[in-house]
Curated annotation (Swiss-Prot):
One of its GO terms (biological process) is translation. It comes from the Bacteria. Keywords: Ribonucleoprotein, Ribosomal protein, RNA-binding, rRNA-binding. The keyword Ribonucleoprotein applies. Part of the 30S ribosomal subunit. Contacts proteins S4 and S8. The N-terminal domain interacts with the head of the 30S subunit; the C-terminal domain interacts with the body and contacts protein S4. The interaction surface between S4 and S5 is involved in control of translational fidelity. With S4 and S12 plays an important role in translational accuracy. The keyword RNA-binding applies. Belongs to the universal ribosomal protein uS5 family. Residues 17-80 form the S5 DRBM domain. This is Small ribosomal subunit protein uS5. It comes from Cupriavidus pinatubonensis (strain JMP 134 / LMG 1197) (Cupriavidus necator (strain JMP 134)). One of its GO terms (molecular function) is structural constituent of ribosome. GO terms for cellular component: small ribosomal subunit.
Length: 172
């Protein structure tokens, strides 16, 4: 079963959301009469201001699979709070054997991330970040690990509320 790793494609629709296709795999189902070929697509959608969604779709043809994945990504969007185009703090995300470390970076650093993580940060609107991935490099697992880490991130006001202090006390 051949695996097709598609180049990351970007598209912007009339709704203002940024779309990127991360991968397209050729999949087969073996039945009594032979093999049934299909395609599985993995995509991310973001608004450039901290909202991000991931979707996967399967179909007999590539365009249909990609469209299904884009629709699912639009439905499953989550909000991540950013700070001046970077992350709030260092965070680690895990999914299966994939582990990703994401660190905020100062202005001018750029997006230092590989493969699927780069696509996520570009559609999300992050302009300065440093990342490192450990373990599995499977695109699906890396995307899920990245989203796990981003959802773990908390703002200074959330931390202050948990501790019962003011934001100024937290930021020092």
């Amino acid at each position: 079963m051949a695996k097709m790793q598609a180049k990351v494609q970007q598209d912007e629709r009339d709704d203002g959301l940024r779309e990127k296709m991360i991968s397209v795999n050729r999949v087969t189902k073996v039945v009594k009469g032979g093999r049934i070929l299909g395609f599985a697509a993995l995509t991310v959608v973001g608004d450039g201001d901290g909202r991000i969604g991931m979707g996967k779709g399967k179909a007999k043809e590539v365009p249909v699979a990609v469209q299904k994945a884009m629709d699912e990504a639009r439905r499953k969007m989550v909000k991540v709070s950013l700070k001046n185009g970077t992350l709030q703090h260092e965070v680690v995300g895990k999914h299966g054997a994939a582990k990703v470390l994401m660190m905020p970076a100062k202005e001018g650093t750029g997006v230092i991330a590989g493969g699927p993580m780069r696509a996520i940060f570009e559609v999300m609107g992050v302009t300065n970040v440093v990342t490192k991935s450990h373990g599995s490099t499977n695109p699906y697992n890396m995307v899920r690990a990245t989203l796990d880490g981003l959802q773990k991130m908390s703002t200074p006001s959330e931390i202050a509320a948990k501790r019962g202090k003011s934001v100024e006390d937290i930021l020092g």
